Amino acid sequence: MGVLEKIGKKGVGEITLYTISDCKYCQTLKGTLQELRIPFTNIDVEQNEAVGDYLESKLETEYYPIICIKKAPEEYTYIISETNLEKLNRIRIFNSIEEALEILLEYYYEIQV
C-alpha cells in the first residue's frame, strides 16, 4: 500500500510522544512540535508505569523521548535514541534532538502529502 493510499485511514500519521518529566530532550521536542503546529499526543511514562515498562521491554531501551508514528493501521514506526534493534526498519535511531526532529518531520510529511 502506497503513502497516498494510506491517507484517510483511521489514525494514520498520528504522532505519540512517550516522555519523562525531567528530560530536556522531551521538553525541546514537545515545544518544537507545538511551534510547528504538528498535532501529537504526549504520554508521560512516569504517570503510567505500565506503558513505560511495556515500551522498555518491547524496544529494549530506557531512553526518552520515544516517538511513535502510526504509518498504517497496525503499522508503527518508532524513533528512539538508542537501541540494540537497529536492524529493524521500523526503528530509527537518533543521536541528537535535531536529528530526531528531522526523522520525525520526514515521516510526518510523507504521510500528510
What are the functions of these language-model segments?
Residues 44-63, 68-73, 100, 104-107, ...:
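Thioredoxin-like thiol-disulfide oxidoreductase module
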Residues 40-43, 92:
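Pocket-edge positions in alpha/beta enzyme catalytic cores
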Residues 28-32, 39, 57-58, 83-88, ...:
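Non-catalytic interaction surface on structured domains
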Residues 2-41:
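Local sequence-structure signature of Cys/Sec-based thiol-disulfide redox active-site neighborhoods
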Residues 19, 38, 45, 51-52, ...:
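A generic structural signal for ordered secondary structure
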